[in-house]
């Protein structure tokens, strides 16, 4: 969420103002409640997102979200639940979205996705089972790892790092699924 998304204080409903206070916020402009008793500051911190490079029978599962254009396939992603570790969160997301069971979950890396104000925690997930997509996904592909083509945004960098660690050559594409 960007600061433009907030117009009113979520605590007391007063209109928010902007403040740049080098002592408290390092000089960054923040939206704040003008009521000193309330004291709300909208920090606009990045949202943690988990992503999975799902490996099933030696192939990587890429899926198309129902909201995406035809031909656009990417990694399984999702948000953490309160009190959930990232490892448990990605195992849950993989199961919820594909019905696959995470057998092994290994950290690939942590990546910025500034455009969406997200911090992506990416994992390689070795999975088992039979794919059954959730309603939010329309279709999937199982791709041989050497044929993967990472994209220059968000989870694409995680896929590139995973491929690089396995000695796989690749070229970046503009968007997922190309």
Model-derived features with residue positions:
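Active-site-adjacent beta-strand/loop module that shapes the phosphate/pyrophosphate-binding cleft
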Residues: 111-132, 145, 162-163
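Charged phosphate-binding loop/patch that engages nucleotide di/tri-phosphates or the phosphate backbone
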Residues: 161-178
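NUDIX/MutT-family hydrolases
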Residues: 133-164
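Acidic, metal-coordinating catalytic segment for phosphate/diphosphate chemistry
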Residues: 2-51
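A short coil-to-beta-strand element that immediately follows conserved catalytic motifs
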Residues: 19-20, 100-109
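Conserved Nudix-box catalytic region and its N-terminal flanking loop in Nudix hydrolases
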Residues: 46-49, 55-96
């Amino acid at each position: 969420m960007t600061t433009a998304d907030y117009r009113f204080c979520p605590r007391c409903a007063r209109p928010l103002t902007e403040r740049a206070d080098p002592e408290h916020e390092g000089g960054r402009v923040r939206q704040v409640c003008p009521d000193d008793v309330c004291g709300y500051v909208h920090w606009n911190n990045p949202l943690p997102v988990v992503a999975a490079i799902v490996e099933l029978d030696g192939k990587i599962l890429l899926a198309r979200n129902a909201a995406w254009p035809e031909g656009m396939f990417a990694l399984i992603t999702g948000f953490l639940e309160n009190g959930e570790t990232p490892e448990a969160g990605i195992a849950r997301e993989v199961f919820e979205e594909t019905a696959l069971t995470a057998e092994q979950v290994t950290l690939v890396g942590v990546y910025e996705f500034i455009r969406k104000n997200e911090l992506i925690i990416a994992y390689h997930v070795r999975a088992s089972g039979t794919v059954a997509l959730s309603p939010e996904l329309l279709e999937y592909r199982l791709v041989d790892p050497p044929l993967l083509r990472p994209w220059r945004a968000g989870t694409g960098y995680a896929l590139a790092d995973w491929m690089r660690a396995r000695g796989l050559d690749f070229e970046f594409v503009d968007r997922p699924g190309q």
